[in-house]
Every structure is written in structure tokens, then in C-alpha cells.
Amino acid sequence: AAAAENLEAYRVAVVTESPRMVMRWRGQTIADLSRAFLDTNGATKHASVAVPARECAAPAAAQTLRGMAGSLKSASRRGLVERFDSTVGAGTLLMPFGGRTQRSPAQAMAALLPVLPGEKTAQGSVMAWGCDPDALSADPYRGAHDAVYTSVAKLVAAGADYHKAYLSLQEFFEKLRNEPARWGKPFAALLGALDAQLELSAAAIGGKDSMSGSFLDRDVPPTLISFAIAPLLEGELLTTDLKAADHGIYLFAGKTPEQQTAAWERFTALARAGKVVSAWAVENGLAEAVMKMSFGNEIGFAAENTVLDWFAPMPGAIVAELSDEVSDAVRIGVTTAEKAIALGADSASIEELAALNDAVLEAVYPTKTRDSGTVESFSHETKTRVAPAVKQARPKALIPVFP
């Protein structure tokens, strides 16, 4: 059989019933060993060993915080935002960036309702959006579901009542081409958004699709953006920047839809009672929340809860700065006069984190002018003009009369 395959084959051994291994060479037995001896692998040997324990430590929290501050996902968009006029109509209630340094980004747009000339109103509206491209690409159902929760959570963090929220969804998807796998992406995303709407009793009014499609081998990523809007009074509006040291920082979150909405209701009750000083709807983790809240007034933060995952996404959760102690929310830390974010033993300065955050898109949307030099000053001399103290104008008028 081997010759038919052009292979050389030789018989080198025969399996027997005898429990011995016998080797012969040129008619002489050169080895005759018991199978039991072979099973022992020869004489037993002993040796002392020492294996040092290796520490599989995760990166320090401050190091991870610096990496997040310098990532595109968390980057400051101040250079882009400042290209638009946020004061048109003189009804703006919430500027795009808050705090003394104007560095804590607002998570919602709030403005007074337009009224007739001469009339005034305290009634306004607040609008926010939610979308995580990474989550949508990984799981369109979960990504769309979380987008709805995030948009509504931003309204709640701004002071609105989630029961009064309405939604509008905008979707982008690749060309479907009658391929079930491609059809599955918008199906899963819309199903996730619908489930979130049913859980929150928030209806979506209309929608928009203007960028779907594919070009050659390139597809738009699965995208569903949730826009949420709700009414609120001018005095109910909350901002995102931390206000003072020695304030408790609390987390309002739930693992189920019922727990999450109950947490929102507790937050709203505290806000109406005047106990909420500032708030942030969590998107990319608790660490990002306290970091961006600290930018505005350079108020520091010291973590007190070592169980939480500070960098895990928590769609729907709200971090709030409270002026009084409360027992029906999870306290995660306290504000400090030190200009640093401390997540355990290590910390990072607010100045360093803000610089990293600003630098990501500085080349694309600059916040500083590249020109240098002096600004030319313009001045005009005033002259005295003589005018009569008593006006004695004698106007003449021609009135044509026809009989």
C-alpha cells in the first residue's frame, strides 16, 4: 500500500501480549525492560521549586482616568460648539459650558418659550440626546435601548419630569440588499428603542433618516439617536458644574426599569426640594461624570465607594451633588477644595485632565487663535459744535387745494 503511494515503509516493531519492551540489534538483545518499570519513568527524582506570585494588577485608576480624558469618546467639543450662537432669540436658559472656567459641558439645551412682544414667561423646554456608537455597533438592540434611557436621563438631570418627556428618533443604517443579516440590524435597534419606550411610557413622535446607505465596500455604522424633550420652569433648571466643597456626591441608579424610574423620581423630589446643586447623566462611566462636573469651577472630588466600577457605562444613572445628606441614594464621594480627582489612593489634577480633554480635538476645532501680535487700537477725537439754545425753525408747507 505504501509503495502504491510512492512511500518507503519499514516494520520496526511488533506489539505483543508480553508486558516487556524488547529491543534487538544485529541478533543481540540490547534492551529488555518491564512495562511496569517504564510506567515509572525510571528512578524517582525530587526537586524543590519556588514560583513567585505574580500580581495581575489593573492600571491605576488615575492612569485610566487620564486615558479616558484624552480619548476621542470623552473629548471636549468646545471648539465646535463655539462656532454656533447659543443666544439667538434671547431665550437661552442654559449656556453650552458652565462654571467659572466655562469648561463643564451642558448635557441639554434649555430655553424659554417664545412669547409676543411685551409679554414674559417662566415656562421653558429642555431637550437632550442619547447615542453610543460603540454600543450600537456591538449590539444594535442594547445600543438603541440605552440611547433612549440616556436621552431621558439627561432631561431628568437637567430638572425635568420624565413623565412629561417625548421622543424623536433618528436612524442611519447600511443598504439592506435583501440580506437577512443586514435587515437584522435596524430590526434589533428599533425593537430595543421600542422596549425602552414601553418601559418609560415615552412615545416617539416622528423620526428622521437622511444618511443611510453604503458606498462600494463602506457602510454607515448602525445608528439610532434618541432625542428627548420635556417642559420645565425656569427656576427648575439644574446645571452640571460642581458648586462647592464638602458636598456629598450621590448616585441615582437602578438595575431594572422599575428601579431606575424610581431613582429618577427620588432625584426629582430632591431637586424640587432644593437639595440638588448640580447633576450629570452618566454616559461613559462615573469617573467621566465627576471629572467633567469638576472642570467648571475646579472643585475636586474624593471617592468614598470602593465597590463601584468607575469606568463602566451606566445608561440612565445620574450623579448628583447634594447640599444635604440623604439616606435613599448611594453616596459615592465628596467634593473637595483640592483641585484633583481622587479615585482611591491615587489622584489626577483637574488642570491636567482638562488639558488632556481639550487637546484631543484642538487641531480640528481650535479654541485658541494661532495668530500673534498686537491689536490695533482705534480712537476718534471729539469736537465741540455750537448750536442755538432756542430753536426758531420756520417750516413752510404747500397744501394744494382743488375746488
Put a short name on every predicted segment:
Residues A1-P403:
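Glycine/proline-enriched, intrinsically flexible loops and inter-domain linkers
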